[in-house]
Amino acid sequence: MLFRRLLTTKVGYHTPNYVNRRLILSVLKSTATRREAKDYLTKYGDPAVAYHCVLYLRGTKTFSAGLINDFAIMLGRLRLLGIRPLVVLSPSKHVMTESEILRETFYKHGLQSIPINEPMASGTRETILQNGASYNSIIPIIMPFVYHQQRAKRMLAEDEVAFMRELVAYMPCRIDKFFIINRYGGIPSSERHDNSHVFVNLSQEYGSLAEVLKQQITDLRHEMDDGLLAERRATDGSYKEFQYTTLTESLTDLELMSAVLSLLLPSSTGLITSMHSAVTNSRYNPLLYNVLTDRSLVSSSLPSFKRDPISDNAWYELPACGAKIGTQRANPIFSTTVLKQGVDIKLYDYSTLTKENSVGFHELLSTAGSAQLPAHKRVNLTKLKGIIEHSFDRNLDMSHYLKRINGKIASIIVIGDYEGIAILTYEGPEKRPFAYLDKFAVLPHLRGSLCISDVIFNLMFKKFGDELVWRSRRENVVNNWYFQRSVGVLDLSIDIGHGPKKDNIFKLFYYGGKKGTQFYDFDRLREYITYVRDIEPSWSRK
């Protein structure tokens, strides 16, 4: 039914809804996989469930009339996709003016809206939203005012994080998306040349990202206050002020995301982007793209290949030669960060699995002669076997497998309650071992959601960034995804010289080194091929 609504239009009569449908279909056809399209239609096509997205606007007064006009059009497109928008303004002395500008612009585009200037009553924890009618066809424009009963006075919220935390906690509706739209875009990343982080797993990265931003703010503040820079302030002072504002607002945006997403379901998604990107009329519109696919515009686990020694640019995330990186903040790919509350991550770096550091299959394990580790530090081999078999749809011979990997385990990565796993071993010559991804599995119903695959590959690339190899069957449908994350790929049946050629059903993938120099070391290549090619699978023949 939803596809039928999107596709139905009169030939030769291009109404605004026709243009909206064409754009949405362009995004859906060019970016969404079959599974994503099915998931989207199943989710938002159900009339019994109403999904809402909160759009938090920062710096609305600074946006041009054209941008506000395009924003109203974008809200109409979001509603066409089956998600209901609620607009929240950030604290500012201009909120009343901003609210009126939005209301008038929405009205011009046939959108009904209602300004709400007392969304909460401080002390009673009751929201006016709870007492109001259901906003099925009306867009609330929520102003950040708090009514203090003791003072009998309405006041602008001083702490926007606390305001949003309380507002969202008592909203009587299902919030599926939380979008922050500002002037500068997503959370800046030094690894991306100060363009935005692609994806942030808050449960894993929030603390470190917040500390980095705080340190950058402190360092920049010292530079701005340093008397030695007085003579330079005339030339670069305004730029440093711009940097300072960007960093402080980015820190607040990160805190807002953490506070709000922690109150929502784990499947909920956050997104931070600039207003220019949010209203772009292309298939790379980050808001439409995320509603349709629930992921970022580019994958966060793609490797940073170096384009040239001067610009040090990465092929997948930086502009073409000659373009200025600073101007890319207006490009959705460079100015958008997608965030999830995320899942717990555990890393077990036991070289050998024993009865003391494992749960299950103790009859196959030896004892280390030490005290048993706490439950959270033990690898659950029963669950490990379960996810591998569920993912590969094959039976794993645990006796054969444990004999093969024990004593040379590099790391075991576990996501959540064994919803995603990676088992890495050290293979190769004793004096020159290399990290090998032996098993990689994600529960079938979670593939593509929560960005589990990207999280696992990012962890592996950070931990084994100099050298990592894995293999995959030639006909594996995931090989294109693997290829995008590798420096190179070889067929394991090729003639490597200095040894017999063997028929093989696998391809070898390699990641490592900023320039992939090891891949031109033919002696090392022979070692990769020889050792990886001859690894015996541990599948049961039953």
From Swiss-Prot:
Task: Tell me, in one coarse class, where this protein mainly resides.
Answer: mitochondrion
Transit peptide, start-end: 1-14
| Protein localization | Mitochondrion
The source's superkingdom equals: Eukaryota
Q: Under which EC number(s) is this enzyme classified?
A: 2.3.1.1
**Which family is this sequence assigned to?**
Belongs to the acetyltransferase family.
PANTHER family recorded: AMINO-ACID ACETYLTRANSFERASE, MITOCHONDRIAL, N-ACETYLGLUTAMATE SYNTHASE
Q: Any idea what this protein is called? A: Amino-acid acetyltransferase, mitochondrial
Q: Which organism is it from?
A: Eremothecium gossypii (strain ATCC 10895 / CBS 109.51 / FGSC 9923 / NRRL Y-1056) (Yeast)
The coding gene here is ARG2
